[in-house]
A protein has these predicted regions:
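Alpha-helix capping/termination and helix-coil
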Residues: 8, 36, 49-56, 78
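P-loop NTPase catalytic core
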Residues: 43-49, 57, 69
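C-terminal engagement/docking regions of AAA+ P-loop ATPases
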Residues: 54-135
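Conserved AAA+ ATPase core "coupling" helix
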Residues: 1-47
Length: 135
């Protein structure tokens, strides 16, 4: 009832106040674009994505466009953590959330009640996280 009554006086969207100015958002996006990803991290991402394309429970793995989106979200995670570079934990923070809708389970997986999240967790656990090299 409250939702219906709320629409009597116009759209509730019209009463929303902005939480950030457009210029600030654009500046943040530019700063995220500048976040550095080392080749070791790119290789880590590529290995994770390749595993989505080879997994026996998946009909479709993450696409190139999905991989680009993942890299963008990884950079955003680093930015939100106050860094201008990506670390493996940034990949961990976003991998499941970004990719669960970008893969398609095959019929065997669906019949066995396997979830996209479960497959992604398995893939993530099966790929070694890069660690700093010791001299």
């Amino acid at each position: 009832i409250a939702i219906l009554k709320d629409h009597r006086s116009g759209s509730p969207v019209d009463r929303i106040s902005p939480v950030i100015q457009m210029n600030d958002l654009l500046t943040m996006q530019e700063e995220v674009d500048k976040i550095f990803i080392h080749d070791v991290i790119y290789n880590y991402i590529a290995e994770l994505i390749a595993k989505t394309r080879q997994h026996p429970m998946l009909e479709l793995g993450v696409s190139p466009r999905g991989t680009i989106a993942l890299a963008g979200m990884i950079k955003a995670a680093a930015y939100l953590a106050g860094r201008n570079y990506v670390v493996p934990n940034d990949v961990e923070k976003v991998f499941l959330a970004v990719n669960h809708h970008r893969i398609r389970l095959n019929s065997k997986a669906r019949a066995n009640h396997v979830t996209a999240e479960g497959v992604l967790e398995e893939i993530f656990a099966g790929v070694a996280k890069p660690s700093p090299k010791k001299n």
